[in-house]
């Protein structure tokens, strides 16, 4: 029997992605806590010649940082999870300016609310302590990548597992 529906997995399989698209998808897989997808995207990026340090700095660290910032703001100010990423900007406008002074900015000086909005949608998947530990694990991985001869794929794979895998208890 032939099926007529096309799934997202079918499209992923058939449509080649740009490196930028894979980097974006890796961030989304981390935010969604989708370990298998995150590891598959890491393999794809490394296969395409991306450097491990580049993947860490462009995809992994910003995702973990934004999840931590969004989770912290949502916890402190009892903010609701946005239905869409761009809704989070309006939510941030309602809290005191000093509460958002530390947030990452775009070149024009405004808060990058879209990336924080994506993080806010997925922040419920993590505890604050997990995200703090994840950011510390990013630092440790950065140090390992630049100061040791450890296999870069192993360093990043272990980092992704540390970030994404659910803690027992």
Language-model features: locations:
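Short helix-capping and inter-helix turn/linker motifs at the boundaries of alpha-helical repeat units
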Residues: 13-18
